[in-house]
UniProtKB/Swiss-Prot annotation:
Residues 1-68 are annotated as: Disordered. It comes from the Eukaryota. One of its GO terms (biological process) is positive regulation of protein ubiquitination. Keywords: Phosphoprotein, Repeat. Inhibits HSPA1A chaperone activity by changing the conformation of the ATP-binding domain of HSPA1A and interfering with ATP binding. Interferes with ubiquitination mediated by STUB1 and inhibits chaperone-assisted degradation of target proteins. Interacts with the ATP-binding domain of HSPA1A. Detected in a ternary complex containing STUB1, HSPA1A and HSPBP1. Interacts with PGLYRP1; this interaction blocks the cytotoxic activity of the PGLYRP1-HSPA1A complex. Residues 23-35 have a biased composition (Gly residues). ARM repeats lie at residues 130-172, 175-215, 218-257, 260-299. This is Hsp70-binding protein 1. InterPro entries: ARM-like, ARM-type_fold, Hsp70_NEF-Inhibitors, Nucleotide_exch_fac_Fes1. The keyword Repeat applies. GO terms for molecular function: molecular sequestering activity; ubiquitin protein ligase binding. The modification Phosphoserine is found at residues 349, 354.
Length: 357
């Protein structure tokens, strides 16, 4: 079978020239602009290389493949398959480390070494699973069951946040993996981490995984609603961790834009009042995303506009003062635009009754 040595997976360094080779003035993806294709690490890379090579030479005249080119292609495909198999073996080794029981009666040094090995395995898996083929193989190897069942609730924060990060990495834009993760009950655990974990890094990584499970994923969003995810998101925006606040507000804004049908639910939760309260806090770049979410909440939604007009909120005065603060400050132009849009939407109408009917 395949050579397991480090040289066994190497591809031929250059594609033998055809009668009319690709121009060296192409995309510049090869090192130094030499025109030699970079060896693909797996089938996905091989496919991308073939697409790129084909796009550089439109409509070439059909001609038989030379024996030299045929041999190169066979070697490239063999190496790509071998590289994929080797990465699967790496994942299996990582899962063996993660599946082991914690050493019984171990001393402090031994426990620290054990944790480092597990963290290293999770980090390697996160790197490998950036590739969608590897992410699918990881799930087929029952890796996701292990993450959700054991590592999201591990005692060490370093294991919890790495598990959450790996779940997000695998789930990004892959519906089949998202469905498996949701079926394992991961979203409930991730929301609990976001809401209650004592480690800020765990909370940030949990939010990343949640975002990967609910954006562009209807089943995930429905679970998110049933688990009162919007309340968890609002509490995250009220924390003192800047990264957590910004990412929570950004996710809220994204969900409002993509799913306007849930605006009524959010208004009934008092979201308008809570967002305005956040805007009243000491000014920070985070406010851009809060005002963006508020804009999304009132756009084409009269109930949101009416709530923004409530006199006790004092929103109009707040927005006008903020506009004055942000004038001539280039770095806050998006926030300024949100303020102006809110003023136009909520406070420029000649009559309040016109929006009620």
């Amino acid at each position: 079978m395949a050579d397991k040595g480090s040289g066994g997976s190497r591809l031929p360094l250059a594609l033998p020239p055809a009668s009319q080779g690709c121009s060296s003035g192409g995309s510049g993806s090869s090192a130094g602009g030499s025109g030699n294709p970079r060896p693909p690490r797996n089938l996905q890379g091989l496919l991308q290389m073939a697409i790129t090579a084909g796009s550089q030479e439109p409509d070439p005249p059909p001609e038989p493949m030379s024996e030299e080119r045929r041999q190169w292609l066979q070697e490239a495909m063999s190496a790509a398959f071998r590289g994929q198999r080797e990465e699967v073996e790496q994942m299996k080794n990582c899962l063996r480390v993660l599946s082991q029981a914690t050493p019984a009666m171990a001393g402090e040094a031994e426990l620290a070494t054990d944790q480092q090995e597990r963290e290293g395995a999770l980090e390697l898996l996160a790197d490998l699973c950036e590739n969608m083929d590897n992410a699918a193989d990881f799930c087929q190897l029952s890796g996701m069951h292990l993450l959700v069942g054991r590592y999201l609730e591990a005692g060490a924060a370093g294991l919890r946040w790495r598990a959450a990060q790996l779940i997000g990495t695998c789930s990004q834009n892959v519906a089949a993996i998202q469905e498996q993760v949701l079926g394992l009950g991961a979203l409930r655990k991730l929301l609990r981490l976001l809401d209650r974990d004592s480690c800020d890094t765990v909370r940030v990584k949990a939010l990343f995984a949640i975002s990967c499970l609910v954006r562009e994923q209807e089943a995930g969003l429905l679970q998110f609603l049933r688990l009162d995810g919007f309340s968890v998101l609002m509490r995250a925006m009220q924390q003192q961790v800047q990264k957590l606040k910004v990412k929570s507000a950004f996710l809220l804004q994204n969900l409002l834009v993509g799913h306007p049908e849930h605006k009524g639910t959010l208004c009934s939760m008092g979201m308008v009042q809570q967002l305005v309260a956040l805007v009243r806090t000491e000014h920070s770049p985070f406010h851009e995303h809060v005002l963006g979410a508020l804009c999304s909440l009132v756009t084409d939604f009269p109930q949101g506009v009416r709530e923004c007009r409530e006199p006790e909120l004092g929103l109009e005065e707040l927005l006008r003062h903020r506009c004055q603060l942000l004038q001539q400050r280039e770095e806050y132009q998006e926030e300024l635009e949100f303020c102006e849009k809110l003023l136009q939407t909520c406070f420029s109408s000649p009559t309040d009754d016109s929006m009620d009917r």
